């Protein structure tokens, strides 16, 4: 039995009690969520994170105290909420998305921060030069990068070889996408594909981006993972509705897209990353520093192919792609 499990067992049986009139002080973990308290996306991040933390012996109210703040999808609130959490002097801060990570890192340079997950470019900037050995107080896990998106686009080209104009739906406020489609041109320049940059920040301007997509006569659409676009159910529904009406194949690095009706998706599993982030939090609570914990790139990817969507589009998915799929939707 590990030390954490041993302490938890003693606490549960009453063999360890705070002295009379004195409350036992538990380590404090602060969590900043950019979404609302009941947002669907938290089921992919906060829930698996907390479940993994509990398996490691950190039960809220018993062996750890957890405080949470929610920005309700308003990024302008993140800096104030981050400062509010830092004022509580937690042992560790946990957050996700590039915007939230930037806000928390801007609020403290001393309290350890675990990010699970965020974009590669932002984590490099926050951690300080080296992913392998962070020099700042930030460590965590990469979800998105230009290289990951280029792999997904290559898969889309394999599935739709006649596509010559591919739209890239990007959030101009996402630092990891400021130079798209330059990385895709570099990685896939020999494919004969022209990329069309389509910008949207959320529900308010997604329709304008889709109108541009129609005017530009794109043959296919790729949606990189972004908390305001790919991970936003309302935006996702409008994009998929557009695709059905225009008969445009869609791929994404956000796995839910394929399950909701896109042709395919390829990317890392957010719940797996969140669970691994819990392991980093546990190690910091036990004395590790962010510098001891390298920022991890995704090592495993899930590929989903939606044959139902392919049939509706009149497409035949190559057998080579079907056999590589981890999940096939009939």
What feature does the model see in each segment?
Residues 1-330:
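Short hydrophobic alpha-helices and adjacent helix-cap/hinge residues
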């Amino acid at each position: 039995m590990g030390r954490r499990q041993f302490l938890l067992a003693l606490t549960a049986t009453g063999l360890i009690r705070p002295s009379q009139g004195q409350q036992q002080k538990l380590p404090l973990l602060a969590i900043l969520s950019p979404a609302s308290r009941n947002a669907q996306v938290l089921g992919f991040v906060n829930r698996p994170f907390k479940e993994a933390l509990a398996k490691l012996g950190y039960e809220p109210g018993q062996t750890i105290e957890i405080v949470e703040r929610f920005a309700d999808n308003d990024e302008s609130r993140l800096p104030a909420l981050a400062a509010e959490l830092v004022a509580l002097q937690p042992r560790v801060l946990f957050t996700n998305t590039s915007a939230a990570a930037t806000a928390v890192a801007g609020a403290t340079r001393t309290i350890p921060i675990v990010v699970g997950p965020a974009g590669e470019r932002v984590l490099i900037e926050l951690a300080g030069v080296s992913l392998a050995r962070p020099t700042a107080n930030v460590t965590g896990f990469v979800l998105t990068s230009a290289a990951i998106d280029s792999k997904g686009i290559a898969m889309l080209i394999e599935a739709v070889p006649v596509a010559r104009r591919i739209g890239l739906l990007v959030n101009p406020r996402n630092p990891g996408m400021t130079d798209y489609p330059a990385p895709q041109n570099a990685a896939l320049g020999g494919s004969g594909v022209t990329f069309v940059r389509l910008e949207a920040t959320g529900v308010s301007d997604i329709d304008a981006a889709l109108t541009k997509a129609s005017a530009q006569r794109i043959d296919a659409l790729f949606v990189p993972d972004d908390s305001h676009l790919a991970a936003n159910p309302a935006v996702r529904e409008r994009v998929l509705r557009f695709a059905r009406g225009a008969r445009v194949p869609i791929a994404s690095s956000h796995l839910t897209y394929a399950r909701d009706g896109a042709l395919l998706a390829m990317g890392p599993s957010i719940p797996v990353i969140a669970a691994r982030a819990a392991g980093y939090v546990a190690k910091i609570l036990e004395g590790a520093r962010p510098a001891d914990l390298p920022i991890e790139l995704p090592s495993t990817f899930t590929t989903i192919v939606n044959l139902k969507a392919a049939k509706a589009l009149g497409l035949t998915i190559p057998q080579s792609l079907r056999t590589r799929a981890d999940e096939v939707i009939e």
